[in-house]
Amino acid sequence: MSAIYNFCAGPAMLPAAVMKKAQQELLDWNGLGVSVMEVSHRGKEFIALTKQAEADLRELMHIPQNYHVLFMHGGGRGQFSAVVNNFLGNQGRALYLVSGQWSSAALAEAQKLAGDTQIDSLNIVEKHNGLNAVVLPELHKIDADYRYVHYCPNETVDGIEIFDELDSPWPIVADLSSTIMSREIDVSRYGLIYAGAQKNIGPSGLSIVIVRDDMLKLPSLTQSSIMDYRLAVEHDSMFNTPPTFAWYLAAEVFAWLKSLGGVASIAKINQQKAQMLYACIDANPFYKNGVVAANRSQMNVTFQLADESLDGAFLKEAEAAGLVALKGHRIVGGMRASLYNAMPLEGVAALVSFMNEFAAKHS
């Protein structure tokens, strides 16, 4: 069977080596004669797995000791609610920076839970010569007392990424669902980081939360034990039964990434992949991208065909060539190629070759 390259935005492809290992030990994990899906989450074997997973993640991201690492339920949308309920209390205020669809969704959930009087927002995307560009605000000039400022450094739907570190007088809460471990960041700049697993970590159903110790002292509104960060810390992410198979696969992905040389090594590969695809788009008037170069996402490359009537043919022929899940999000249309850590350079090269051939045939 010829290679299939999956460009899905999420759930995304997992590293082939991780999938093969999971397949090999699916029915007999650690010599126990049963699957990892069948063992007790409180058994010594699984506890050892969780400890190693946290240690590997701390090493990969250089997480300081005054931060807790949590493995939680609920995905990114679950964290939209959890952040508000854990940090705002009855009187606290927060600022949301809006750069695309996912930061807008986080804002909407915050407004639903806390109301407009507690939630402020700023749109940070402007049009520069017809292209979307991020303009970060000078937060130090804002006269307000916020519990936190929330932003999403990578917008998967819009193909927008913010590479500059946010400078804020208030704790920063960041949705890193689509960019976690794709490039190095300084974790110590953040009050809390959360990420749904289904892009760069593992399968859906698991969320990673990295929270600074002092954030847990803020007044809480949460009435949901399952999304209470303090309870999660107290119970080592096992207040209730966790998504054990997703946790196992995340642990394997962390080990795989370490074997490649860590985040610094994969960041170079990710940069190569994105540059290769954007070069193809820029070199051919048959394709167009709507984001300024400085804010083009490395993880989610969005593009449109000059002739939209060819969209269906493009997708059909791409799939026949082993290039799947390239259809853009329903809100924006066009195409989207997601280049998460597990996507090999060969997959992007195959896509570029197909795009050049398709353009030549239809120009």
UniProtKB/Swiss-Prot annotation:
Please, one GO biological process term?
L-serine biosynthetic process
Q: What does this protein do?
A: Catalyzes the reversible conversion of 3-phosphohydroxypyruvate to phosphoserine and of 3-hydroxy-2-oxo-4-phosphonooxybutanoate to phosphohydroxythreonine.
Name the record gives this protein = Phosphoserine aminotransferase
Q: Which domain of life is it from?
A: Bacteria
- Keywords, A to Z? Amino-acid biosynthesis, Aminotransferase, Cytoplasm, Pyridoxal phosphate, Pyridoxine biosynthesis, Serine biosynthesis, Transferase
Its pathway? Amino-acid biosynthesis; L-serine biosynthesis; L-serine from 3-phospho-D-glycerate: step 2/3; Cofactor biosynthesis; pyridoxine 5'-phosphate biosynthesis; pyridoxine 5'-phosphate from D-erythrose 4-phosphate: step 3/5
What EC number(s) are associated with this protein in UniProt? 2.6.1.52
**Pfam families reported in the protein's UniProt record:** Aminotran_5 (PF00266)
Binding of L-glutamate, residues: 42
Catalytic reaction annotation: O-phospho-L-serine + 2-oxoglutarate = 3-phosphooxypyruvate + L-glutamate; 4-(phosphooxy)-L-threonine + 2-oxoglutarate = (R)-3-hydroxy-2-oxo-4-phosphooxybutanoate + L-glutamate
Q: Does the keyword Amino-acid biosynthesis apply?
A: yes
What quaternary arrangement does the UniProt entry report? Homodimer.
Principal subcellular localization: cytoplasm
Question: From which source organism is this entry?
Answer: Shewanella sp. (strain ANA-3)
Recorded family membership: Belongs to the class-V pyridoxal-phosphate-dependent aminotransferase family. SerC subfamily.
Q: How is the cofactor bound?
A: Binds 1 pyridoxal phosphate per subunit.
Q: Name one GO molecular function term.
A: pyridoxal phosphate binding
Q: Name one cellular component (GO) term.
A: cytoplasm
Residues bearing PTM N6-(pyridoxal phosphate)lysine: 199
Q: List required co-factors.
A: pyridoxal 5'-phosphate
Species lineage, top-down? Bacteria, Pseudomonadati, Pseudomonadota, Gammaproteobacteria, Alteromonadales
Kindly list the positions annotated as binding pyridoxal 5'-phosphate.
76-77, 102, 156, 175, 198, 240-241
